[in-house]
Amino acid sequence: ELYLISPLTEPERFLNKEYFLTAQQRDIERQILKKIWAERTGAYWFTGLPGTGKTLLLYDIAMKLSGKQRVCMIHCGESKKDWKRLHERLRRVEYLPDSEIGAKCGLEEYSAVLVDEAHLLEPGARELLAGISTRRPVIFSGDCEDVISPDELGESAEMVWKSVPGVQTFRMTNRIRTNAELSVFIQNMMRLTRGKGRRMYPHVSAGYGNDEEEAEKLLKGYLALGYRYFEENAGSSEDVERLVVLLDERYFYDETGYLRSGNRSVRRLFHRLNQAKEELAFVVKKNEEVYSVILGLLQAM
C-alpha cells in the first residue's frame, strides 16, 4: 500500500513521507540526479503506462532538488484542482499550469523544471522547454501511448523528446497503482495483435444498445451499481473504483488492428479507461463490429 500513494490526491501522506519508491523508481531517480548534479543541465524523459508511479517519482525528485534551490513543477491537462491541494502545503516547489508556458513566464529563474503529464504539452511549449534544457535540467514525465494508432496521435510528445539532442530516456514497466487485469485488457482492446496471451477478465463487462434508448437504460443500470460515467470531453483526471464508458458508431478497427474513431478521440478514450481502478464496463451503441471484438476478448478462454 505504501507504493500506491498519489502526491496529488494524498498530499498529507506524501509530505509525511509515508511511501516507498520501487527499485525501478530508485534506479531512474539515481541516474537522473547523478547527471544533474554533475552537469546542471539536460533533458530527461521517463515514460510508462498509467499507474507505473511516474508522478510519485517526479515529485520525489522535485523534493530532493528543491532542498537548496528553486524548482518549478509544470502540470499539464485538467488536473489543476488536484495539484492546488498539494501546492497549498508544499511551498518549496513552485507551480505553473501548462497554459501559462511562454517566453515571459520566468522559467529561466529556476534551477530545474519538472513537467508532469508531458504527453499533453502543446508543440510550442515543447520547443520552449527543449531550449531551456540546454541551460538547466528539465525533467519530463508522460504516459506511454504505444498502443494508440499513430493516425490518432499525430506527432507524439515521446517522439519529439527522443529527437532532442542528448535527451536521456527511461521506460517504467512496473505497474503499481493500475489493476493489472484492466491494464492488459485496455492494451489488447486498443490494438488487436496475434500472439497475445489469453486470460480471464472477470472485472470487465459489456452491454449492447441497438439505439439511444437501449444504451441509456444500460448506462443507468451501471450507474445504479456504483459505476462512474464521464462525458467524452469532461476534463476530470480522477481515478475511480468503477468506470463505465460509452462507445458509439464512430469507433472502428483499421486494417492494422488499431482502434480508431471518426473524430480522433481514441487518445482521450485511452486515458479515460486507465482511470478505472477495480472494474470497467462498456456500453456499445449501434456498433456491432466493436461489440463483437470486446466480446471476443472477454470470451477468449
Functional labels for PLM-detected ranges:
Residues 11-22, 29-52, 56-85, 90-93, ...:
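Conserved helicase motor core of SF1/SF2 NTP-dependent helicases
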